[in-house]
Amino acid sequence: MSFVPGQENAGSRSSSVNRAGNGILKKTTWADQTERGPNNQNRGRRNQPKQTATTQPNSGSVVPHYSWFSGITQFQKGKEFQFAQGQGVPIANGIPASEQKGYWYRHNRRSFKTPDGQQKQLLPRWYFYYLGTGPHAGAEYGDDIDGVVWVASQQADTKTTADIVERDPSSHEAIPTRFAPGTVLPQGFYVEGSGRSAPASRSGSRSQSRGPNNRARSSSNQRQPASTVKPDMAEEIAALVLAKLGKDAGQPKQVTKQSAKEVRQKILNKPRQKRTPNKQCPVQQCFGKRGPNQNFGGSEMLKLGTSDPQFPILAELAPTPSAFFFGSKLELVKKNSGGADDPTKDVYELQYSGAIRFDSTLPGFETIMKVLNENLDAYQDQAGGADVVSPKPQRKRGTKQKALKGEVDNVSVAKPKSSVQRNVSRELTPEDRSLLAQILDDGVVPDGLEDDSNV
């Protein structure tokens, strides 16, 4: 007995099917009303079956076979179409797990001309065919064929063909593709009819122009079972929504002084054991200064809190709530009553002590040890360093100018000597003596030496 996807048995379908003239049970769908409307608007021409991408003319490689399921269209370039083992077979009523085997066929769609005259190729669309049907009906499961991706369920016997009848488009509409829970749809692809299908939106607009009765009937028949697989488009949709609102999803939110103050106050309003320190509310504001009883945290980690890049690996060592209560020594201690503002309030402390044991086989062991050694009792090093380093003296305005002025005042400046004094105090060099002897031999006394002869 051959199986028909979407049909469990003829007896269980009374109100949702119409009997055609040839005795074939035909399902009345929203597509029947939109594509083959009852108003007979084709002016006497024969009703044509709804064309799919596999039968459209001038659409690349024409496939003369109808798939039982709607296609999966690629919308991002460079993405690979593949499924994990045991996944990828569309589910349909009436098809047992043993027959869930087949292949996805790549249909190369047509190209179109852009306004600037360039040819642009549409990204391909994939259609599913059961093993032994479709354009590669004679191929065996796993054959290396370009544009074919083989899929099968874990219970299917891939050595035999699937006992599935070919789809007659005049009797059966294509079933919206949906997968078993847990199936991961390839990234960069979407299921036709899952919300991004242009033909669906155009058909919906046509149905709205046919009066209120047809609109109501069309909307009721339009309810198709949605695919259980959600394409990886959450980031894209969020970015589009934010762009519509005038916000940029790629830019981080700017933190102002007012917002930082609000974040800090919100953290401090929580109970002490529920606080999470960060850049806006550092560790010491949440839990107090470091000391013998709170001895963890270096300068960088105290400033960043849980925003420190090293903190996540330390969080792996933190106990769970159950480990805290059942793996620690707990003691309930009553402290002094509340302060003057609330003297009737009783204050208790749940004191605890325990240990976290790990060894060198723990992933990231060396990094954990390094971070622990840097942050345990780090307050001691910080305190010691503060005592050793002397504070930087503050510069007083005008000190340097006054010092320079004092140095100038302390310098004694001698009065310049006359030309006679300079000549008397100066010793004659051998060159001077030879020149002077030559002058005296000539009998010419130079000006300025007449009076100096007596000196």
From Swiss-Prot:
Pfam families associated with the record: CoV_nucleocap (PF00937)
GO molecular function annotations of the record: RNA binding
Compartments where found: Virion; Host endoplasmic reticulum-Golgi intermediate compartment; Host Golgi apparatus
Ranges where the CoV N NTD domain occurs: 64-193
Residue ranges annotated for the CoV N CTD domain, each copy included: 260-383
Modified residues (Phosphoserine): S170, S194, S390, S425
Biased composition regions of type Polar residues, renumbered to the chain: 9-19, 50-61, 215-227
Modification after translation, per record: ADP-ribosylated. The ADP-ribosylation is retained in the virion during infection.
PROSITE patterns cross-referenced by the UniProt entry: COV_N_CTD (PS51929), COV_N_NTD (PS51928)
Positions with a binding annotation for RNA: R109, R125, R167
Bias type Low complexity, positions: 193-212
Top-level taxon of the source organism: Viruses
Basic residues: bias regions: 393-403
Annotated spans, RNA-binding: 56-197
Region spans: Dimerization: 267-384
Disulfide bonds: none
GO cellular component, one term: ribonucleoprotein complex
Residues where Phosphothreonine is found: T177, T429
Disordered: annotated segments: 1-62, 159-230, 271-292, 384-428
Family, per entry: Belongs to the betacoronavirus nucleocapsid protein family.
Quaternary data: Homooligomer. Both monomeric and oligomeric forms interact with RNA. Interacts with protein M. Interacts with NSP3; this interaction serves to tether the genome to the newly translated replicase-transcriptase complex at a very early stage of infection.
Functional summary from the UniProt entry: Packages the positive strand viral genome RNA into a helical ribonucleocapsid (RNP) and plays a fundamental role during virion assembly through its interactions with the viral genome and membrane protein M. Plays an important role in enhancing the efficiency of subgenomic viral RNA transcription as well as viral replication.
Name of the protein this chain belongs to: Nucleoprotein
Species: Murine coronavirus (strain 1) (MHV-1)
